[in-house]
Amino acid sequence: QLTAPTPCSEMDVRAMLGHLVGVLDRIAALGRGDDPFAVTETPAPDDRWSDAWTTSARRVAEAWRDDAVLEQPMALPWIHGSGADVLASYLSELTVHTWDLATATGQQPDWDDTVVAEALAARDFLPAENRRALFEEISTAMGLDEVAVPFAEATPVPDDAPAIDRLVAWNGR
């Protein structure tokens, strides 16, 4: 299934797995006070994705183990806030891409309501309207001209749709 397409049109399953490990590495970099945009995504061998994920997750836990990091001000093109706010925005990305992988591989996870609620709350840092232009403006102001816009335009979904559906719709799925 590694070559199967995902709803994130520029990535197949293999590329998505590499991206998710890279996201964890960026989260760890932020926790250490390093530049998350200096992190490069390095694909793992096809039979080592689980090991790569576990190693990167341990780096995240180590980098964020001091609660003071949660209070530190941090800035990314899509959010300026505390470390906790930035973590929530990455939780949103990880949740959406987990949905992408589940969809691509025919799985239907039992979504954790608390996790999805936190991921949904994180989307409030950027408006659904005109956010691409805002993202590009902020990226340029931060000197990050090479950072790709991490979401597509929001798609309509009923207000009473399941939380995971509202989250992925906000991200253009």
Language-model segment annotations:
Residues 1-9, 29-61, 65-173:
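Structured surface interface patches that mediate subunit assembly and partner/cofactor docking
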